[in-house]
Every structure is written in C-alpha cells, then in structure tokens.
C-alpha cells in the first residue's frame, strides 16, 4: 500500500511512525470492508484522517444545482393538487456538480468524501420516529420535495414521506450481534448525498461504512474517473447488477416502466438450481445404507444440545450421553452438514434431520417445490410467492397486472431464512418491495387479504395463525405424523387492510416481546369457540383440509431425488413446525370455503409451550420417531 507523504530527510519521524501505526490498525479493522466495497487503497490514508477529525469537505469540491421546469396548472384545484405532490411545481430536479476550479482527480489521495446520514431507522420504527423526533418530518419532507406546513406532524405528510422514502433509502446490516440486531438498517443520506442522481455510466461510487471506533455510519464517495468543473456527480442506483432486465426493475422507483408484456409465469427451477443450493450449503449427501436393527427393549443413548429435550425427555428407553462416540441418536439444534462422513463411519446413528430439508424450511425453496403441486402459480395452500433474487421481473409484471385489473395488491416481504417475523414487512408499495431486495435475500408472498378471523371478546375480530408439529419418520416409504395438540397465536388489534406497519394488527408472534400482551387460548378451548363462531365449518372438516395440504406438501418435497427432494436416508428423522392461516376462498361452484395457507415450515421449533402444558410431548415425539411406538402417543398418522 502506498502512503502519501512529502520528502523527509533522514529516518521517519515520530509523527510518521505514529501515523503508520494508526493506519495499520485502521486497515486491520476496516480493510476487509473497504476492499469489499471497492474503495481504492490509495484513498485509505486520507479517509482515516477525515474519519478521525470528522472532516466533511465535500462542500469545497461540489455544489447542488436545482433545475425546475414549471408548467402552468389549468386551474386553482389543479395547482393545489400539484402542491400536495412530492416535488411540487413541475419537474423538479437536483444535480450535484463539481465546483472546484481544478476539478476532481481520481488518483488524488484526498478524493474521498464523507457523506453524513440524515435519518437511520428500521422500517418498523419509521412512522413513530417521524411522528415523535423533533424536526425529522420537516427535514425529510423538505429533502423529498413534499410541502409541509405547521409544526404538528400531519398524517398525510407522514404517509407521503413513508411512500417516497424508498427513492432515497439505502441499507446496511451489522455483521455481528443477535438476530434482532442483524435486521437490516435503512438510512437516508444528507441533502448533499440525496441529490446525487443515477447514471448507468456513473462518475462516482458510494458505499456505506461503519466506523467502529466512533460507532458512526457514513457513506463514502469517491471518483471513478477525472472530472472537470461543471461535470455532474452521479452514481449507479443498481450497482452490481449487469442483467438489463433486472436493472430495469431495480430502477423502477426512479424510472417508471411498463412490464405488462413480460410473462409472470414462474415454473419450478431446473435441477442445477437445487445443486447450486446444495453446494452453497456445503451439505454432503450420504451414501446408501441399510436400516440398523436394534434388540427388543434397547435403551437409546441420546447426544443432545436442545435444552427443552434435555429438560423434558423422561421416557425410560432414552438416556443422555455427553459423548458423540457413544450415542445412538444425535438430536442437535444446529444443521448437520456432512452426511457422507456419518453414513461411512456411523451409519447406525439416528439423527433429527434429513439431508436437503432446507427445501421445506427455507422460504424460497418451499415456494419452488410447491409448484410441483400447483404449476407455475403454485398450489392453493401456499400464497403466490416470488423469489426476489431470481424472479423480480415476473413479480413486477404480476404486480402491474393486478394493479391494472384493480385487484388487491398487498404483499408481505420475508427473509428466506428468519423466524419470529423478523425483517418481515407488509406493504402495497411496489418501490418498497423492489428496494427490500437490496438488503437480505427475500421472498415476497401475496398477503392474505381475506383471512378467517377469530372474535376476541376483549378486542374484536383478529387474525390468528395455527402451528402444528409434524413428525417425519421416513421418506421412502413416506410416513408423516401430526401431534394432536396444535397451538394458536392471535393478533392484538382488529384486522383491517390499513396501518400496515402496525405489528399488533398484522402479526401474531407476540411471545418474544415482554412489552406485548400474549393472548393464550388452548386448542381444546379454541375448537368449541371456533365452531360457535363458524357453525357451518366443523373443526374436523377444517383440520382434514389442513392435513390434506400437509400431505401434498410432503409428497412433492419427497417426489424427486436429492438435491431436488428430501434425501431418503434411513437413519434420519425430523420434527417440523408448520405455521398456517385460513383464508376465505370460493370454489368454482360458488361455495365459500376455508382454504389453509401454509406460511412456513420451521426446523427445530421452539417447543416451550408444548413442554409447559403437555409434559409428555417429547416422550411422544421420541416414541414416534425412534421407537415406532404410537399407540399411547398423542399423534395422528397423516401419510
């Protein structure tokens, strides 16, 4: 690395040695991030200086130019409507240009600039911050060109800012911390950074940067070529994407485009797609083995790191061991990877996982394999789902088709592989969905706009979801059981298709937030209440439809050889939690029906409530999976 300094006689002085040491420490801490962002090493020395001393010198090199084309409105009503729009007054455009008489040189070590962040938040907190943080709404409205009068936050202005923010938002996420702390953060650059416009041939690059010593996030700006006075500073809003069609979709928030001519069909991906997932997961498939017979009454030694199992498995046929070498059963919380080694060295060891079970438990894979049952649009028991990484153009086309037909267009964005509704967002804003693609890998699913509701006497008609525990004994032959007890989760506020960021209205997971009320209704209390509210729908009939959906799901998941389907490994067993809702639908004959909608399949689910209210839960699970004894267990065979 070159360290720029003037000529010095003799050996380096103390200050230079100190600077060199500080730079080494800086590179040790931040070098990987800077390299990943493409920041040239020649700029690192001055970057450190500017970070240490909080040097914001972009104003010495650049200026903001405003271009406005005013069109006469036809009448006062039209002018008033125009004033309420973002960027009132016609085509209002800002540009950042080089104002330094000497221009900007890409090889100048000083050609890196800090951009401050005007607003940083997580999406679920945005509305509250706009309403409560002094001056924030006013600043954001001004930055976005939204007219704002008075001091009291107007709901209309708040709504406009929340809609327009997706044209200005950038994102990063922390690499370390809890699952909650790693949820992506969205930020809006200051007035200078937010005025930098898009170009497919950008003159500058930007990257978010978290300076750890001061725990402050900035955006770094540096030139990609030399610029003369008056030239525009631009960046690529779809940086890193080469595919022209994907770029067109990514740029829709700023460059509207009609995608109606594009097919929104999403057939199941080819075999190589699943092979790539297998390799990315570093999962090694097992060799073929024969089931190992054990003597009558054999006591199984269980190596387990799941606390709920350790605390509640009391069946006399199972005992715990700390030694993996002595174990008959591995019941592990983390995902197992090297099935090949296990099949070679310990084929007799049973375990609580199947090779390739991510096809069920990861949301994009679940949507892909489900198309085997329902074709490109998916089966009736899974909401229409698109993988935003691989199916963005199809989704945009589908969204625009629904919009043109006047159909409901509420969607829910979910990370591929997070539970507890983390980083999950309900929206009808296409720009928001497109931009969410830039954070973590996500799917977008049709939001259930007509859910079957449950009347809570203390609240009103609320959303609810149902969790079933299913036990997969084997793939070939396919043997699947459901635990007889199911669990219910309820929203805390009456359902309506508004206030889409109101967690307690649109979500049901309440047991992880100590400040939120958890409504507890046991299954045996729920069934008579449900049948009283919906006398035409006996619960036995509803559950039969639910089990029919489970049957189809596992049939398609096991229909193809790995990595396109679950692997038939004789030593594998598994317990999954399936979360679902009920949706009102109409059959072709006009009959109104409750259609189960599978939301997700969870590996190693939290069974705290099961253990608390049903002490025999894990005894039943282990008897079913490992002993093939179900007569005295609370399970029902589905397949």
Curated annotation (Swiss-Prot):
Stated family: Belongs to the tubulin--tyrosine ligase family.
Keyword Transcription: no
Function noted in UniProt: Negatively regulates post-translational modifications of tubulin, including detyrosination of the C-terminus and polyglutamylation of glutamate residues. Also, indirectly promotes histone H4 trimethylation at 'Lys-20' (H4K20me3). Probably by controlling tubulin and/or histone H4 post-translational modifications, plays a role in mitosis and in maintaining chromosome number stability. During RNA virus-mediated infection, acts as a negative regulator of the RIG-I pathway by preventing MAVS binding to TBK1 and IKBKE.
Key words of the record: ATP-binding, Cytoplasm, Cytoskeleton, Immunity, Innate immunity, Nucleotide-binding, Nucleus
Tissues expressing this chain: Widely expressed with highest levels in brain, kidney, liver, lung, muscle and testis.
Single GO molecular function: ATP binding
Location within or outside the cell: Cytoplasm; Midbody; Cytoplasm, Cytoskeleton, Microtubule organizing center, Centrosome; Cytoplasm, Cytoskeleton, Spindle
Residues annotated to bind ATP: 445-448, 463, 465
Protein name: Tubulin--tyrosine ligase-like protein 12
Keyword presence, Nucleotide-binding: yes
Residue ranges of every copy of the TTL domain listed in the record: 295-639
Gene behind the chain: Ttll12
Primary location recorded for the protein, binned into one broad class: cytoplasm
Database matches in InterPro entries: TTL/TTLL_fam, TTLL12
Organism this protein belongs to: Mus musculus (Mouse)
Record's subunit section: Interacts with MAVS; the interaction prevents MAVS binding to TBK1 and IKBKE. Interacts (via N-terminus) with TBK1 (via protein kinase domain). Interacts (via TTL domain) with IKBKE (via protein kinase domain). Interacts with tubulin alpha. Interacts with histone H3 and histone H4 (when trimethylated at 'Lys-20' (H4K20me3)). Interacts with CBX3.
Pfam families recorded: TTL
Recorded GO CC terms: centrosome; cytosol; midbody; nucleus; plasma membrane; spindle
GO BP terms, alphabetized: innate immune response; negative regulation of type I interferon-mediated signaling pathway; protein modification process; regulation of mitotic cell cycle
């Amino acid at each position: 690395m070159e360290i720029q300094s003037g000529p010095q006689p003799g050996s380096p002085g103390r200050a230079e040695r100190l600077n060199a040491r500080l730079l080494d420490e800086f590179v040790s801490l931040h070098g990987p991030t800077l390299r990943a962002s493409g920041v040239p090493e020649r700029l690192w020395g001055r970057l450190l200086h500017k970070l240490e001393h909080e040097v914001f010198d972009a104003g010495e090199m650049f200026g903001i130019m405003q271009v406005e084309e005013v069109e006469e409105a036809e009448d006062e009503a039209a002018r008033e409507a125009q004033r309420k729009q973002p960027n009132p007054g016609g085509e209002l455009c800002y540009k950042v240009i080089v104002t330094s008489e000497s221009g900007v040189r890409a090889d100048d070590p000083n050609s890196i600039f800090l951009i401050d962040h005007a607003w940083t938040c997580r999406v679920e907190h945005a509305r509250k911050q706009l309403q409560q943080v002094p001056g924030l709404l006013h600043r954001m409205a001004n930055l976005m060109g939204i007219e704002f009068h008075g001091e009291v936050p107007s709901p209309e202005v708040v709504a406009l800012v929340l809609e327009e923010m997706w044209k200005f938002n950038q994102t990063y996420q922390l690499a370390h911390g809890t699952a909650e702390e790693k949820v992506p953060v969205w930020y809006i650059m200051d007035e200078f950074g937010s005025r930098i416009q898009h170009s497919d041939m950008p003159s500058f690059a930007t990257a978010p940067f978290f300076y750890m010593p001061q725990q402050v996030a900035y955006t770094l700006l540096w030139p990609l070529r030399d610029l003369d006075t008056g030239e525009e500073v631009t960046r690529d809003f779809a940086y890193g994407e080469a595919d022209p069609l994907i770029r067109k979709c990514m740029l829709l928030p700023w460059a509207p485009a009609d995608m109606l001519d594009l097919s929104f069909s999403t057939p199941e991906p080819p075999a190589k797609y699943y092979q790539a997932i297998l390799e990315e997961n570093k999962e090694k498939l097992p060799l073929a083995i024969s089931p190992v017979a054990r003597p009558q009454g054999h006591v199984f030694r269980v190596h387990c790191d799941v606390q709920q199992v350790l605390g509640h498995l009391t069946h006399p046929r199972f005992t715990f061991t700390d030694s993996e070498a002595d174990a008959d059963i591995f019941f592990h919380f983390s995902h197992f990877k090297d099935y090949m080694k296990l099949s070679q060295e310990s084929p007799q060891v049973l375990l609580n996982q199947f090779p390739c079970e991510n096809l069920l438990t990861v949301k994009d894979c679940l949507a892909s394999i489900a198309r085997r049952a329902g074709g490109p649009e998916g089966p009736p028991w899974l909401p229409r789902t698109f993988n935003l990484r691989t199916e963005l153009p199809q989704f945009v086309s589908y969204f625009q088709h629904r919009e043109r037909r006047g159909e409901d267009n509420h969607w829910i964005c979910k990370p591929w592989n997070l539970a507890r509704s983390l980083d999950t967002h309900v929206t009808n804003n296409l720009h928001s969905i497109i931009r969410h693609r830039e954070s973590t890998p996500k799917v977008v699913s049709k939001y259930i706009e007509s859910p079957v509701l449950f009347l809570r006497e203390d609240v009103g008609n609320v959303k609810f979801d149902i969790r079933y525990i299913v036990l997969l004994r084997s793939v070939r032959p396919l043997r699947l059981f459901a635990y007889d007890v199911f669990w219910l989760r309820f929203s805390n506020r009456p359902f309506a298709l508004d206030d889409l960021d109101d967690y307690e209205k649109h979500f049901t997971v309440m047991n992880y937030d100590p400040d939120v009320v958890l409504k507890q209704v046991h299954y045996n209390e729920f069934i008579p209440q449900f049948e009283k509210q919906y006398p035409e729908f006996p619960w036995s009939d509803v559950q039969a439809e639910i089990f029919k959906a489970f049957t189809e799901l596992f049939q398609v998941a096991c229909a193809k050889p790995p990595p396109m389907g679950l692997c038939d490994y004789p030593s594998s067993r598994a317990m999954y939690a399936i979360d679902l809702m009920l949706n009102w639908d109409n059959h072709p004959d006009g009959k109104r029906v409750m259609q189960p909608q599978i939301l997700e399949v969870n590996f190693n689910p939290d069974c705290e409530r099961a253990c608390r209210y049903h002490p025999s839960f894990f005894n039943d699970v282990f008897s079913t999976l490992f002993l093939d004894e179900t007569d005295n267990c609370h399970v029902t065979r589905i397949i």
